[in-house]
Curated annotation (Swiss-Prot):
Keywords: Cytoplasm, Protein biosynthesis, Pyridoxal phosphate, Selenium, Transferase
Gene designation: selA
Localization annotation: Cytoplasm
Cofactor(s) listed in the protein's UniProt record: pyridoxal 5'-phosphate
HAMAP family, sorted: SelA
Taxonomic path: Bacteria, Pseudomonadati, Campylobacterota, Epsilonproteobacteria, Campylobacterales
Name of this chain's protein: L-seryl-tRNA(Sec) selenium transferase
Enzyme class, UniProt record, top EC level: transferase
Amino acid sequence: MANITTKETPKITPDLLKNPYQKIINASASVFDEKHGRSFFSPQFYEKIEPYLKEVLTHPIDLECDLNTAKKKNRLTPLKQLFKACFNTEEILIVNNNTSAVFLIANALAQEKEIVVSYGELVGGDFNLKDILLSSGARLHLVGNTSRTYLRDYRLALNENSKMLFKTHNPAFKKDTPFKDLQALAKEHDLIDYYNLGDVDLLDRTALEEVLALKPSLLSFSADKSFNSVQAGIIMGQKEWVETLKNHPLYRALRVDKITLTLLFHSLNAWVNHQEEITIHALLHQTKDALLQKALKLYALLKPLELNVSIASSFSKIGNLFGRELESFCVKIQSKNTRALNGEKLYLRLFQKGVITRISCEFVCFEVFSLNEKDFEKIALVLEEILNKA
């Protein structure tokens, strides 16, 4: 008789019970990167909302019950009212991220129908929009090329199976078809017009307001970067289409919970009334002189160490937002004993201590865009420890 081996159950060790994520110092060139948890709250914002957040997390709440009528209510009602007041939109829906928004819209409104979309708007970044749309059950009719698409390309693509004209925000496009022209074409042929803003250009928030002013059938974007909030996908648009999405069975799998709704409400509140509390607002409004002063302060702390230290001009970027560079400065370091501690070893040892940098031509570079003075002190201490052990 063959021996039957059973798989041993893994033991629950103390290491498995440690907090799974730790704070890092982001001295890389990518701000609000997905690998780093994307956006984050400022300390003053968190301190302000912490008492209410504690109440929501430690008690039952009226998430879906109306205390005035004793009837069931929509969990989105408080946020819908605020969003409508802020953006003058007909209707709103919130799902767990913008990818969910794209998938839900395509699945609920264009399954087995054609979505006409520019080829160039499916190119670039890690987010594979084409796969998401195809997985929804919709068919894609690609028009144009990687850098140019004209209105006539959309018009020639239309047929009896066409259901939606789809546009994705792409600032790198050389020849872009204005969304208002797509809207006119959609209206002419009784089609849905949908604008996927994705990660809205945070240095130009008018992009969102301009599209909303056109009263699109549908619009979606990411909440975390736009409002410095939790991960969520915001769908706005005409009531007819948003109601169809809300009543679709898939929506229940994609809807957000009480924590997301609470944090999103307070983020939008701060976005309207107290922008100084928003981390994104503070970082993106740094002057070039302020960034240089940050670089000089870090330089002064690192210069006494056994390092070659210099300052250079550089660029940072917002996550995977294509085509947007932020002027900045970096502090470049190199060990004076490169045999014992070359650039790659130094980069790795910093990484292991939670200090995320970039490496360029044997130099380790600290991008100062996301750093603060407490970070400078920690970086100096970590480097001193690494050099003493080298």
